[in-house]
């Protein structure tokens, strides 16, 4: 009985294990089937290709950008420039941006350049206004006013010429000449000839002659003095004296001193000084340089890094 019980237990265990295994297998199979069932959707690749056409459709959409709506807007902008007749505002706007870039200094120059343009624009409107109507009136009025002044002198001249005509008559000229010599004309010309011209030329002619005579006496004096030049010929003998030669002799005497031994001593002293450097001490002095070089190499790197 015990064996049977044991056998039944074992069989139940085996059955349970088998059931578990079968269930697991089924589950794995179901899962495998599911996994296999899922691949089929990927196999429905045709739909994606069908969906792929939409991209071409999207590419077909670009034509909308091809539509001219946007260009019309810029065209309209170019149509607006007619108001550009008020061009000063745009330049003013374009000139104002630079100041922001150069915060303090540029503003002043920009303002300077801003002020000139207005005057330039002002003449244009004035010209326009002139061409509209003012031009004719202005020149006409100008030409109307000048003639009067021109005529004004003419009348005066006419008045002058009006009085001469009477003198043109035979008796009139005689009276005119007589009258001129009597008082009006004579005084002016007589006064002119009496003092201004005569004194000046007389004084001029009086002063020049003396200078002309002065050179003659000078020449005369020169001709009187020529004899002294003969003493000049007498003076040459002094140069003949031997004093000059002594100077060159002294010059030749001076070179010898440099040739004396004194100069050599100086070079000897120079040669005496070099030997000390030849002593062994200098090498030790040269030994320090390595550390200096090392120190120099240590210091430069930081600047390079910076």
Swiss-Prot record:
Per its UniProt record, what Pfam families does this chain match? Extensin_2 (PF04554)
Q: Would you indicate the residue range of the signal peptide?
A: 1-32
Q: Which residues form a coiled coil?
A: none
Q: What post-translational modification information does the record give? A: Hydroxylated on proline residues in the S-P-P-P-P repeat.
Biased composition of type Pro residues is found at 38-122, 133-152, 183-214, 225-290
Q: Where in the cell is it found?
A: Secreted, Primary cell wall
GO terms of molecular function: structural constituent of cell wall
Secreted among the record's keywords?
yes
- Region Disordered: list its residue ranges: 33-306
Which biological process terms from the Gene Ontology are attached to this UniProt entry? plant-type cell wall organization
Keyword Glycoprotein set for record: yes
* GO CC, alphabetical: extracellular region; primary cell wall
Q: Keywords assigned by UniProt?
A: Cell wall, Cell wall biogenesis/degradation, Glycoprotein, Hydroxylation, Repeat, Secreted, Signal
Protein purpose: Structural component in primary cell wall.
Q: Which PANTHER family match?
A: EXTENSIN DOMAIN-CONTAINING PROTEIN, PROLINE-RICH EXTENSIN-LIKE
- Protein's UniProt name: Extensin
Specify the species. Answer: Daucus carota
